[in-house]
């Protein structure tokens, strides 16, 4: 009986150590992924957009793209760019 209890306690200790190692590895991966996302986000912010895209917030100083129009939609409390039922010419 003592051997069985000792084996169970030892197995639980091994599982605890393995899960701690897995958590540390997962945290390192998530930090690396977060850094990568922030780098991509910073790179995209440097590019100036000349128009707002679909469902983007729009005002007079932030116009929508050519195939979109700025409209007020009820559940949203600000104007958004919606499709004006035309297609952009290439």
Swiss-Prot record:
It comes from Cyriopagopus hainanus (Chinese bird spider). This is U7-theraphotoxin-Hhn1a 7. Ion channel inhibitor. Keywords: Disulfide bond, Ion channel impairing toxin, Knottin, Secreted, Signal, Toxin. It comes from the Eukaryota. GO terms for cellular component: extracellular region. Transmembrane segments: none annotated. Disulfide bonds join 51-65, 58-70, 64-81.
């Amino acid at each position: 009986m003592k051997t069985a209890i000792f084996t169970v306690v030892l197995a639980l200790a091994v599982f605890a150590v393995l899960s701690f190692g897995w958590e540390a590895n997962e945290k390192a991966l998530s930090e690396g992924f977060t850094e990568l996302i922030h780098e991509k986000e910073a790179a995209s912010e440097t590019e100036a957009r000349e128009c707002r895209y679909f469902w983007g917030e729009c005002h007079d100083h932030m116009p929508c793209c050519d195939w979109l129009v700025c409209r007020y939609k009820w559940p949203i409390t600000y104007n958004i760019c919606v499709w004006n039922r035309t297609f952009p010419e290439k």
